[in-house]
């Protein structure tokens, strides 16, 4: 045997040994983790984190929202949930099942009873009375596309007909975003999905519990120290992650056989000043002093209603540093007061995009929504940003459409629902081959059916007033104007309790199975008739066995 043939026989042995070592290094820890995971499950340590768990609704089988689903995405004590929902296991023939995906704006915050999905539901019921529609809103506070995707994945088996995606506001501040306080931030898609999987296991839950302290949810003020400039390289990864998640969510939805509507996100431009601003990095001390003097003089002129003169000084300041979000907002406001609405809108949008507390979907997020929707067959686009802008005489979304930064008013929710309704009506017409009357119920008709009373308008305005008394809203340059607008609505015109009750009773008579109507009526009645309130709240029970309480904590079911 020659040397060359001997080397060929001997050489594979070290390679096999290395392969064995590598395989052992991988498989043994995995096996140990598997044993630990199985042991924890057998010992009932931890909780399931699937989106849906079995339940019954009035004795009929259903899948209900799992209150532990969001735990992998939030620190202990800060878990946020959607408006609770249950999906019937038996889908009746002819039923059209719609799932709404998104964050708090999609959910309908500040009150899901009057979110766009509720308007959509009554529109469909009124115009297509012979069909049954199920509109399930899965939107939730503080989540983003990293959470929306697993929600869609687990809803895909529930025989959906349509997914409506209204998402993009929380890509920076939500889980795994560069400005978040909820999880590790700014990770790649593989790292994010691995983290979600590990945190969902019983082993991951135990390690997370041991390694973290329980925290209290404090809303938007928790993020004050998490400013992310538009120029940050982290934004590039944020946009890439959002697009990847959006495409994957659409793919999951389409694979289920459902149609998909993607909506752009409407944000308040005109009446929501930036939450925080930052100067460009390379600004010299001399340039900063010059900028501050121009800014100071411009503010004095603006306060004196000398908008043209103020605009000149603001423009000079922007030539020194054009990255300061508040300056862009002042330029926009001056242009608006000079009736140059087109230019004003551009600067309002840039002020939003430069805001370093990134609670609003920026121009790039909406560009991704448009691009992705138009690039995939059978996906429809509802350009809410454009549609709601066009509803304003000046073409700029303000507080009549969006309460504060992103949450839609009744008018905003109605306009968004109307566009989604028209898409669905067109689809139903094409499927049946018939001419279907797609006239949209008026906003007033919808609000009668939803029992949006003067009492509720005032109640919601008071809730928004309370929110705006905390940072970061108190840091906005137009904070006092925002408070005045909401205070005026909160005072409102007087409505007697009897009138309010009659409006609820009329709506419930039209839709006796509407749990949301019963819930809101019960909450209203609590101040007048505890027994009647308990009865109504009991009828709003999301599924059998779920505890129902009065506002004072008394359990009624």
Model-derived regions: residue spans:
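Short coil turns that delineate tetratricopeptide repeat
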Residues: 160, 322-323, 356, 512-513, ...
């Amino acid at each position: 045997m020659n040397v060359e043939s001997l080397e060929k026989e001997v050489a594979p042995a070290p390679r096999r040994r290395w392969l064995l070592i590598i395989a052992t290094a991988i498989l043994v820890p995995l096996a140990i983790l598997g044993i630990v995971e199985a042991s924890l499950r057998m010992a009932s340590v931890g909780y399931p984190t699937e989106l849906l768990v079995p339940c019954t609704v009035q004795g009929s089988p259903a899948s209900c929202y799992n209150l532990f689903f969001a735990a992998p995405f939030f620190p202990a004590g800060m878990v946020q949930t959607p408006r609770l929902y249950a999906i019937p296991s038996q889908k009746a023939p002819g039923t059209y099942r719609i799932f709404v995906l998104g964050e708090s704006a999609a959910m309908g915050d500040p009150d899901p009873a009057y979110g766009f999905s509720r308007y959509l539901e009554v529109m469909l019921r009124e115009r297509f009375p012979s069909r049954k529609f199920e509109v399930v809103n899965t939107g939730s506070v503080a989540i983003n596309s990293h959470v929306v995707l697993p929600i869609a994945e687990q809803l895909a088996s529930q025989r959906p007909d349509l997914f409506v995606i209204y998402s993009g506001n929380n890509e920076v501040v939500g889980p795994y975003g560069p400005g978040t306080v909820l999880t590790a931030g700014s990770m790649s898609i593989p790292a994010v999905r691995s983290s979600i999987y590990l945190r969902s296991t019983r082993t991951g839950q135990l390690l997370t519990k041991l390694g973290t302290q329980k925290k209290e949810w404090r809303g938007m003020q928790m993020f004050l120290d998490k400013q992310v400039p538009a120029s940050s390289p982290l934004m590039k990864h944020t946009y890439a992650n959002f697009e990847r998640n959006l495409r994957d969510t659409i793919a999951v939805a389409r694979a289920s056989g459902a149609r998909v509507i993607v909506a752009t996100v409407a944000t308040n431009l005109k009446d929501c000043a930036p939450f925080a601003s930052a100067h460009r990095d390379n600004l010299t001390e001399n340039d900063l002093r010059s900028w501050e003097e121009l800014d100071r003089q411009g503010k004095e002129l603006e306060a004196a209603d000398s908008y043209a003169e103020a605009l000149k000084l603001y423009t000079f300041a922007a030539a020194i540093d054009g990255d300061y979000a508040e300056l862009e907002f002042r330029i926009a406001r001056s242009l608006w007061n000079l009736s140059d609405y087109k230019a004003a809108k551009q600067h309002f949008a840039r002020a939003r995009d430069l805001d370093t507390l990134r609670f609003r979907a920026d121009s790039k997020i909406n560009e991704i929504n448009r691009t992705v929707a138009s690039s995939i067959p059978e996906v429809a686009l509802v350009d809410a940003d454009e549609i709601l802008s066009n509803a304003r005489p000046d073409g700029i979304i303000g507080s009549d459409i969006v309460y504060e930064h992103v949450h839609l008013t009744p008018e905003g929710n109605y306009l968004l629902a109307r566009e989604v309704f028209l898409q669905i009506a067109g689809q139903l017409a094409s499927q049946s081959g018939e001419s279907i009357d797609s006239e949209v119920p008026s906003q007033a008709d919808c609000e009668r059916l939803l029992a949006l009373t003067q009492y509720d308008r005032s109640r919601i305005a008071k809730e928004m007033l309370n929110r705006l008394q905390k940072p970061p809203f108190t840091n906005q340059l137009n904070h006092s104007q925002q408070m005045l607008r909401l205070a005026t609505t909160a005072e409102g015109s007087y409505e007697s309790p009897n009138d309010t009750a009659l409006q609820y009773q009329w709506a419930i008579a039209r839709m006796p199975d509407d749990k949301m109507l019963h819930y809101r009526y019960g909450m209203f009645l609590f101040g007048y008739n505890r027994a009647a309130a308990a009865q109504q709240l009991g009828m709003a029970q999301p599924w059998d066995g779920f505890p129902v309480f009065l506002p004072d904590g008394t359990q009624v079911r």
